[in-house]
Regions:
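Metal-dependent phosphoester/phosphodiester hydrolase catalytic core
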Residues: 23-344
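Sec-dependent signal peptide recognition
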Residues: 3-12
Length: 344
């Protein structure tokens, strides 16, 4: 065997090993709060990540509609369809909704056009005709992804369709702990217990509103403390490790409760007080509320590091060989701001 042939063979073998190493990493980007009326330069950065999947965590359009024709929602979807880059449509997409693509700010089961909004939502995402969400009430779903020898159980919750009405006060939402108060509704809870029992190495739970934080005045699971405890107990009673992804807040952060980690990523293009009219509204608010809205030093007992108020996205890199998940929150340029490494 001549030397030239040997060198070529070694080179091809090296390339093969390199490709095998790359193939063992599965990348999932995620984010929330995507305003169709604003520029979306962040997609260019995310394209460079060469992700396998993207998870939309709610407020994927801003189309609040209080009339039965849902004209504002239809227009919002029409505009957003033009904004979503073509390369993204070739990836595996997972999506849940929050209040602004549900149809009403901070809305729940009292929204009388929720059935119509659900069909518009599914049409926008080109959900297949046999998608269970086409025939069920609510947009919750369960999907299994196999990555080499790893099995991911992606569970998307609907925190709007069945949710009991809330009571808003000047200092935030009043906690409601009556027995009939619900976040998910009876049918979705039954389904969730079943979804959690699926054999998997890692659960990725999608909730549009935050699960772990308790100390801020905005929407969160803690508004229904019994429901939050119920969810944490359900997650604590299974052996599979869980990562919660959430949005809504127009800020990003990392939270930890025992073996459960929650990553909040928000917003993709709508940072807090980014426009002149939002700044005007903030200036008209009481100082105490304004400070809580824009102060990145908000603290919570489960919070790790300071919150991020600039435009951001999340990136989850799953290493099936070393059985680890690296979760990063990145800015619009792709620079990591915070990271969290979790063993599977």
């Amino acid at each position: 065997m001549n030397k030239l042939y040997t060198y070529r063979l070694f080179f091809l073998f090296f390339i093969f090993l390199s490709n095998q190493s790359i193939a063992n990493d599965y990348k999932i980007a995620f984010g929330s709060c995507l305003d169709q009326e604003l520029p979306q330069p962040i997609w260019k950065t995310i394209e460079g990540e060469d992700v396998d999947s993207f998870i939309f965590l709610g407020d994927n359009v801003y189309g609040d509609s209080m009339d039965g024709k849902l004209n504002k929602m239809k227009l919002a979807y029409k505009k957003q369809k033009k904004m979503i880059p073509s390369w993204l449509k070739e990836k595996d997409l997972f999506y849940i909704w929050d209040d602004h693509d549900y149809g009403v700010n901070d809305g729940g089961s009292e929204y009388k056009y929720r059935k119509e909004a659900q069909q518009l939502y599914l049409d926008f995402w080109n959900s297949k005709k046999d998608d269970k969400r086409r025939s069920q009430e609510g947009t919750y779903f369960n999907s299994i992804i196999n990555i080499d020898d790893l099995k991911l159980n992606i569970i998307g919750l609907d925190t709007r369709y069945f949710r009991s009405s809330t009571k808003n006060r000047q200092d935030g939402y009043e906690p409601l702990d009556k027995e009939n108060i619900t976040m998910l509704g009876k049918d979705q809870w039954t389904w969730l217990y079943d979804a959690l029992s699926n054999e998997a190495d890692l659960i990725i739970l999608l909730s549009s509103v935050q699960v772990l934080p308790t100390n801020h005045q905005f929407e969160k699971w803690e508004i229904f403390p019994n429901e939050r405890v119920k969810l944490l107990n359900a997650l604590g009673n299974i052996k599979t490790k869980t990562i919660i992804l959430s949005g809504d807040r127009h800020r990003a952060g990392v939270y930890e409760y025992g073996d459960i980690v929650e990553i909040t990523s928000s917003s993709l293009n709508k940072a807090i007080a980014d426009s002149w009219y939002e700044k005007l509204i903030l200036n008209l608010m009481p100082k105490s509320i304004r400070k809580k809205l824009i102060d990145p030093k908000e603290q919570d007992e489960f919070q790790i590091n300071e919150l991020i108020s600039e435009v951001n996205y999340g990136l989850m890199t799953i290493d099936s060989i070393n059985r680890t998940v690296l979760i990063e929150i990145k800015d619009i340029s792709g620079k990591p701001i915070q990271s969290y490494l979790k063993e599977i």
